[in-house]
Amino acid sequence: MIGHLAAMLPPPSTNSPELTVSELSAALKRTLEDRFGIVRLRGEISNYRGPHSSGHAYFCLKDQNARIDAVIWKTTFMRLKVKPEEGLEVIATGKITTYAGKSSYQIVVEAIEPAGLGALMALFEARRRQLASEGLFDEERKRALPFLPAVIGVITSPTGAVIRDILHRITERFPRPVLLWPVRVQGETAAAEVSAAIEGFNALPVTGQGPLHRPDLLIVARGGGSLEDLWGFNEENVVRAAAASSIPLIAAIGHETDWTLIDYAADLRAPTPTGAAEKAVPVRADLLTSLNDLQRRHAGAAYRLLERRRSDLRALARALPQADSLLATPRQRLDRTATRLATACLRAQDQRGLVLGRLAHRLSRQAPHASLARLGQKLEAFGRGLGRACEIAQERRRQSLLHLGIRLTQNFTQGIRVERERVHGRRQKLASLDNRLRQAMSLTLSQRQARLANLAQLTRSLSYHAVLARGFALVRDETGQPLRRAADIIENHVLTLEFSDGCRQAVAGALVATDPPVDPKPTRKPVQKSSSPKPSSRKPKKSQQEDLF
């Protein structure tokens, strides 16, 4: 390569023009790019501080004896499967080029892969320690799985044996609805699809608020494979999505010996996808057996408790005194109180009857019939007077117009124009007076009619017919006088019963004894004797026993 560069330079003894720095830099750039093209470098990443604000990444690749600058452009950095990390030994694939600003050469990296299994394990441990320091793997964050989820969400490949094993195991143990979110479980886009699926399930509405029900449990599953095949489940975005999931999550990645970072962040790790299905739902037959056993034990316990309560009740019943001896004194006290209560009720009824009689007499003197009749007569007389006044006024206007016409005829030649204007004005005034008169008549009639309607409504509300309309009846004797008490009715006399829609005649029968209403305020408090009387040996009458019970 040095000989090739020397051949491009002019001999010192010639008169060839000199090269500029830019020309020399461009020549070196072309020589390096044409000579090496795409290369694969193995080295350790150093001086890496994360992507620049522009999105590009700058670092160095070094070994024991040398180092080279490296750059990853933004578009390439976004699609890298393995991101650069400080101290990670990698194999970088890219093109050798120069940077004219520093007169140095560098590699433009197109792809990065860990340099062997040891590098991947070192990256795995470093990432695990970083995420653990943030508390993503703490046991306090993990939630208990639902005992019997209504809907189970599965995130895996739709074509592999994993989904078939999960569906078969769930159907065999306890059939539950399963929502599958198909994703790639290997490759460059696997991590992004798995994290998007976890976030998508968490974004679904709760049960009953949309066409898709939000799962009660998530299963992230994949079959076995090498560390490189399972690396997508070690990506930081997948681990953070699993830790942030509000739905309990089971991770079933690979076989029992395979561990990924999502296993640490999940609420439960299953050794295999089949084991995840077994953790998700119980065995229906075992539940039925346990339920039947609990039912038998509950029935036996209830029977034993009932028998024990029956024995206790029998023992307590034998210790109780006889009911007749306990109720003898209260029954006698009740008989005496009932007799006093009947007397007090009759006395209160008489007092209320006197009060109602006085109120009825006052109401009959203030009945609105007379005032309504007087108001009607006044209204009728006012209407007749108003009509006569209108006729007289119209007649006077006609006479005035007649005189005006005669005068207009006599003085037609001198002032016909003036008289026409005067006649026109009088007609307008007459029309105005007539209109005002009619309005006054209409207003007065409306006011009188409204007052008459109010008085009629008052008459109806104060009349006893409103009481009859509510289901009561007015009882009159043969002379037409109202009867207020049953004791005033003579047996076998003809009575007139007035209802709201008419009258009926009836013949009075015998007086029937009924329970008088209880007066809440007796006029006299019963006097309690100091010594209780002896129980009477005489049995109460049949009618009294019926009234009491």
UniProtKB/Swiss-Prot annotation:
Residues 511-549 are annotated as: Disordered. It catalyses: Exonucleolytic cleavage in either 5'- to 3'- or 3'- to 5'-direction to yield nucleoside 5'-phosphates. One of its GO terms (molecular function) is exodeoxyribonuclease VII activity. The keyword RNA-binding does not apply. GO terms for biological process: DNA catabolic process. Its EC number is 3.1.11.6. InterPro entries: Exonuc_VII_L, Exonuc_VII_lsu_C, OB-fold_nuc-bd_dom. It is found in: Cytoplasm. Pfam families: Exonuc_VII_L (PF02601), tRNA_anti_2 (PF13742). GO terms for cellular component: cytoplasm; exodeoxyribonuclease VII complex. Belongs to the XseA family. Bidirectionally degrades single-stranded DNA into large acid-insoluble oligonucleotides, which are then degraded further into small acid-soluble oligonucleotides. Heterooligomer composed of large and small subunits. NCBIfam families: xseA. HAMAP family: Exonuc_7_L. PANTHER family: EXODEOXYRIBONUCLEASE 7 LARGE SUBUNIT. This is Exodeoxyribonuclease 7 large subunit.
